[in-house]
Amino acid sequence: MKPSIILYKKLPDVLLQRLEEHFTVTQVSNLSPQTVEQHAEAFANAEGLLGSSEKVDDALLEKMPKLRATSTISVGYDNFDVDALNARKVLLMHTPTVLTETVADTLMALILATSRRVVEVAERVKAGEWTASIGPDWFGSDVHHKTLGIVGMGRIGMALAQRAHFGFNMPILYNARRQHPQAEERFNARYCDLDTLLQEADFVCLILPLTEETHHLFGAEQFAKMKSSAIFINAGRGPVVDEKALISALQKGEIHAAGLDVFEREPLPVDSPLLAMPNVVALPHIGSATHETRYNMAACAVDNLIAALQGNVDKNCVNPQVAK
């Protein structure tokens, strides 16, 4: 008899068929208490859980006593109560490798869009303001040969450094939990403390996961240390930044501009002051959102769940210790 799983994210037919070759699949649209109650028997018997963006906490796990593995279609897992999963010996699988290049592309796009004011001037053209040869009030700033500061030199940081170094001749500073000899050898990157990076970088790119240690890591103190001409980029997790402090720094001119793909609250409220600032490029968390990469992420998550329920946690497992 096939193990039962809950699927809470719509998948392409070919991936759904692959799941159904291995499991009895119950599809739901979300993990709300109402949905769990409506499908109580399926949740009670499920050994696997696959999807993205929904909160998985102890209250849900209480309803899933047979759960052995959950697989998220994402690299981040801050919506999972990892302690609760560990306590119940439930494996957590994620997709850390397949989105690297695409997210690095998004970061580079934010760097270019903010420095060259791409969104702002495009909107001015559409509004009919381009009526003569443009003057300095339309000008942006160069990207090439400017100093890039990367906070978090993981896979995505490395991919961004590659683009910046070889494509734009940018000197690279980085701050991370440990030094990265490969980054220093390949990209001539210089490891430094966070204060030095903030003071010297023309672009500060934040690529960190959300943890207890990183929550509000960037606040008023950090923005005050940046150059007034510096541009802040965040494509990691929104709550790593104190958004009120960011808004204040932009309003006071402590920093020049910001390119943001993540926010403390998502979707970003329509009355956020960030949306009224022409020097802010705000994206709807599109870091990995291409057709190709999202398919590959879903395929990876499917493979991860199959592997986990077969006892294989050699890769992409957040908590392999619970399998021992």
Curated annotation (Swiss-Prot):
One MF annotation (Gene Ontology) recorded for this entry: glyoxylate reductase (NADPH) activity
Keyword terms, alphabetized: Cytoplasm, NAD, NADP, Oxidoreductase
InterPro entries in the record: D-isomer_2-hydroxyacid_DH (IPR050223), D-isomer_2_OHA_DH_cat_dom (IPR006139), D-isomer_DH_CS (IPR029753), D-isomer_DH_NAD-bd (IPR006140), Glyo/OHPyrv_Rdtase_B (IPR023756), NAD(P)-bd_dom_sf (IPR036291)
CDD domains from the UniProt entry: GDH
E.C. numbers: 1.1.1.79, 1.1.1.81
Catalytic residue list: 237, 266, 285 (proton donor)
Family of the protein in this entry: Belongs to the D-isomer specific 2-hydroxyacid dehydrogenase family. GhrB subfamily.
HAMAP family to which the protein is assigned, alphabetical: 2_Hacid_dh_C_GhrB
PANTHER family named in the record: 2-HYDROXYACID DEHYDROGENASE-RELATED, GLYOXYLATE_HYDROXYPYRUVATE REDUCTASE B
Name by which UniProt lists this protein: Glyoxylate/hydroxypyruvate reductase B
